[in-house]
Amino acid sequence: MSFFADLPKDNKKCIKIGSPLALSLSDCLACSGCVSADEAGALSEDLSFVLDLSPQTSFVLSPQSKINIFNLYREDGMEYREFEAVLSSFLRSKFNIHRIVDTSYLRSKIYEETYREYMATNHLIVSACPGVVTYIERTAPYLIGYLSRVKSPQQMAFSLVKGSRTVSVMPCQDKKLENGRDGVKFDFILTTRGFCKALDSLGFRRPARASGKSLCSMEEAETTQWNIGTSSGGYAEFILGKHCVVETREIRNGIKEHLLDDGRTISQITGLENSINYFKSSKTKGPRHKMTEIFLCKNGCIGGPGQERVNDVEMDIREYDRNGREQPRIFYSSPGLEEKRVFREVKAKRVDLRVDW
């Protein structure tokens, strides 16, 4: 059942036609009322901000998107830190820039707030994936009480750029679902793919090498501050670092369980099928572990469906890990970001009772 009949879908086929059981993260899921709540918005990219370069503009960039763009555009021998300076300089040359913020700048703040929640509850579900949040709100409301209320990196970054025209660049379409809630209202939220189209239209096809002046002029907030752990944010790894891990078990591809010395377990789940199985099993048994970190994408955020896939996702993962080892420090500022996310059960509204399979 489609909630958005007769809306253009940019030539994308409905997942119900031909193979109703074939499901991927790039498909529209609005017909089941689970992950995507806005079919039209998820399948479109508004690039109109490139038509008017004069307003004061701020960019919020995810490190996953920046790594993907780096692997698409870099010249031979160019290092990631140099590419960051090239990208920032290019944006400043084209736009009236107020601020550029890499979302990793806020990770230490997020880790600390998440750890406080972890210590105060028996069961915690941690995710900056809006697909997870939307699925739970619409399909698994019995888990709402366990969701971490700490804002996602994109939501926290908005606090640093609001007041100017704001453009956010994220690795998946579902990050648009964070807009208009919890005090967050970006003017534009683009996938990495959409941002690359904007860069191409502005002439960013073969970036010039960065000068020493460009490298020195970058603000701390606009450079990637590498996290620990996975490409999805390192929530579990940060908490595991505060405990003694007795054993780590890989249950299957995309599911890991870490047994702590106090007898409690922290689990990490990635992938759509693994995530849905977890939601379903928790309905009857409840959350089994002290904490579960969960993301819908198979490889975490680095493998988001909004990434440009000229290169294999493994290339992005290798580059992310390599640069992570080169930049071990984490910086953050604390601009009054203690506001929490608010969750609510959402009743799926049906237009009619006709199911068009």
UniProtKB/Swiss-Prot annotation:
Which is one GO molecular function term here? 4 iron, 4 sulfur cluster binding
Any keyword Iron?
A: yes
Entry protein name: Cytosolic Fe-S cluster assembly factor NAR1
Keyword presence, Iron-sulfur: yes
What is the documented function of this protein? Component of the cytosolic Fe/S protein assembly machinery. May play a role in the transfer of pre-assembled Fe/S clusters to target apoproteins.
Give the gene that encodes this protein. NAR1
Positions annotated to bind [4Fe-4S] cluster 1: C14, C28, C31, C34
Q: Whose protein is this, by species?
A: Encephalitozoon cuniculi (strain GB-M1)
Query: What are the protein's UniProt keywords?
Result: 4Fe-4S, Iron, Iron-sulfur, Metal-binding
Q: InterPro entries from the entry?
A: Cytosolic_Fe-S_CAF, Fe_hydrogenase, Fe_hydrogenase_lsu_C
Residues binding [4Fe-4S] cluster 2: C129, C172, C297, C301
Tell me which Gene Ontology terms the entry assigns under biological process: iron-sulfur cluster assembly
Tell me the protein family, please: Belongs to the NARF family.
